[in-house]
Each structure stands twice: as C-alpha cells, then as structure tokens.
Amino acid sequence: MVRDGAKAPPHHEGEKLIEDCKVERFTMNFDDTPQEAAFRAEARKWVDANAPKQYEAELSKASLGRIKLENEEIVDVGKAWQKKKAEGGWACLHWPKEYGGRGATPIERVIWQQEEGVYGKLTQPFQIGEGMCGPTVMAYGNEEHKRHYLPKLASGEQIWCQLFSEPAGGSDVAGLRTRAEKRGEDWIINGQKIWTSGAHYSDYGLLITRTDPNVPKHKGLTMFFLDMKSRGVEVRPIKQANGMQEFNEVYFTDVVIPDHQRLGAVGDGWNVSLTTLMNERMSIGARLATGFPEMFEFCANLMTDDGLAIDDRATRSKLASWAVKASGLKYTSYRAISALSKGERPGPENSIGKLVAGSMLQDIAMYAMDLEGAAGVFTGAAEEEARGQFQQMLLSSPSMRIAGGTDEILRNIIAERVLGLPGDIRVDKDVPFNKIPTKGR
C-alpha cells in the first residue's frame, strides 16, 4: 500500500504495511522508514516499466490465485515474468545474492509483494520452490547444490515441487511408507505420493522417504531431492471438481537417486522436513487469500430485486463481520513480520491466520452464490457479474483448509503452543514403525 496522499497504480492490492517494530515486539509503526520508502519507490518504478499489463484485468479477477489465462499457458507466462524479475534483481528477494536473490529484509519482501500486486499471481508455479524447497536446500544442501540449483530456481529455469503427502499419510507426514533402500552409492526408491502440486510441470522435487522401519516413525526418515524426469517416476494429474488439474499422484518404481542428492543425515529427514513445513506455513501466510476484497466489490455492484446487495442490512452485517476478521488477519501477519524484522522466529501467527482465512474464504464463496440466486448454480451464467470467480472459489476453498496443515492440525498447534494445553495422546510414541498396527495386519 502507498503512503497517504500518493496514488497507487490499479494493480496494487495491499494495505499499508506495519513497517518497523519499535522498542517492544507488539509496538508497531505504520510508516515506511526512509530506506523502505526508497525501496518501495524503486520497486514501483520497475513494476510499472516491466509488468505484463496485458494480463492485468484477467489476473485481478482470478480467484485464489488460480490462474487460467485464456490464450497462453500460465507456466510459460510465469517463467517469462520470473526470468524478467531475476534479470532485474527482483526474484526470491530474501535469498542471498550469491544464490539468485537480493538479500532483502522480511519487510522489503512484503513491500515488494504489495508493489508487484496482481502480477505476483503469475509466479504461482514457483511459490513452492521459492518458499519451501529452496530454503530447505539452502539449510541442508552443500555449497555445490546451492550454487547449481538455487540460481536456476530463482530465474525460472527450473520449477520444484514437494513430495510429502501419501494416500495413508497426509496430516500424519511421519506415517509415510515410500521406501528408500541403500545400494552402493545410490538409493532405490519405491512408493507413492499424492496431492503433489505442480508435479506435472516440475523439473525437480523434494522427496521424503522411509529408510529405517525398525525405529519409531519420526526417526526413520530421510530427505532427498530428485530429477522429476528420472526413470521410474510416473506423474498422473488429478482432475479436480473445479475443472483444473493442479494436483498429482506420483509413483516411484525402482527410481535411482545418488547419495549426494540427500539433504541432511540418514534418519534425520523429520528435522529436515520441519524446515520445509515451517516455510510452507510462512509462504502460505504471506499471500493469504480471504475473498473479502472480491466480495466487497461484488456486493457494491450487484443489483438484486431489492436494490444493491451492499444496501441490504443482513449483507452489511456479514460484510462488517468479515471486515473485522480481515483486519485481524492483517495485523496478525504484521506481528509475524515485525518479529522476523528483528531476527525473531514467529510464533503461531501463521497457524491462526490460515485457520481463520480458510473458513472465511469458504463462507464468503457460499454467501456470494446465495446472492447470485439461480445464476450461482452455473459458472457460465454468472460470468457477466462475477466471471464465475465465486463458483471457482467455492470449489477450491476446501483445499485451502487442508494444504499446509488441516484445520484440526492448526487447532492442535494453537491449543498446545498458545493455550498450553496438553498434547494429543499418541499410542504409537516410541513404537517401531513396522510394529504399528495397520489394516490387514
């Protein structure tokens, strides 16, 4: 968001950032520092000069960042934008310069997201690589890994995916069954992953496997990265209810991964995965969608039998409630940003934010369709008023309550880390993985 009195270009979506944390963690200043104001001006100038403005109108109507450009493939357009950002020094801002980034502060990163606006949706194919896989490679890879792979990820030359969830191990990541067996200097991988976003267009993947079934489930895991074009890797896109194919099943049959593509020690995969999962929640939280801006605009323009929707008392009451939640989410995220700006680790802010935003998104989509009446049943019939964005939002919103941690997992985090309640009873604690009862055994 721009400072008071300044005019923002139409693609700016953000609110003014709470910039600088003063004295205490929860004392926050709304204004840009001189350095941040200069950074914002530089970013705005570059975006105005380089953004692919032919896509602005379509991007502004894309619900949840689910982009489906009419005439061009999103991956190709995204790669072109990512490459241009890398050439201009605006890709993966928070990464070190030697790995393709800019060494920017957390607040500068948020300022950039505000100034990039709707064009940030074009980089959707790179969000997992930048926000989750890249930081994991940075933390556990050797220097050769970092200098070879990270600049290519930052420039858009490579796309990465995250291979964690399995048919019998979604929220319980440590319950995974994909096996990795050591043979000489290589590892042989067999198993299956599911709900892998972007696997069908990814070049590399971050893969967590089970290397020792004779120890408790969290202790027998090992992390690797692999070429998604490796022999024995089969990717099957999953057709979704909204007509898109963002997720995939991935099968591994005697896939060979050299030991030098291991991240972390053998058996330490759980600790490595915590780095990935922590960055996943932060990545999701950075661009948390609520549907409120779209809903407010929709109600302000939708004419019903009784007049404008926004003039209806019941609708105004709902909008007021959502506005309060949206404001709370904004300031909760600012708290996390303030902590990061001081070098602190954020608390449970992203869990709280995702939990509230996910349910809010679903509620808004359902109410919008109620307002549309009969037109809400068919995407095409509503195109004139809302371009079908709320129908797409309703079909996609359940996934937002699952990806990056289900509502139940997030409530457990809040209960245990914020309220200090005792953790769930775990009957499999300290039990070797191969001794845990399963169906058919």
Language model features with spans:
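Alpha-helix capping/hinge segments and adjacent helical runs
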Residues: 49, 53, 86, 90, ...
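Internal helix-loop-helix
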Residues: 78-157, 197-204, 326, 340-348, ...
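A short core secondary-structure module
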Residues: 177, 185-186, 190-236
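Glycine-rich beta->alpha junctions and the first turn(s) of the following alpha-helix
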Residues: 30-34, 39, 233-331, 339, ...
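Amphipathic, small/basic residue-rich leader segments at the start of a protein or domain
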Residues: 21-127, 148-155, 284-285, 300-301, ...
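C-terminal helix-coil-helix/basic helical segment that borders enzyme active sites and/or dimer interfaces
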Residues: 56-63, 304, 313, 327-383
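A cross-taxon signal for low-complexity, glycine/charged-rich
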Residues: 3-20
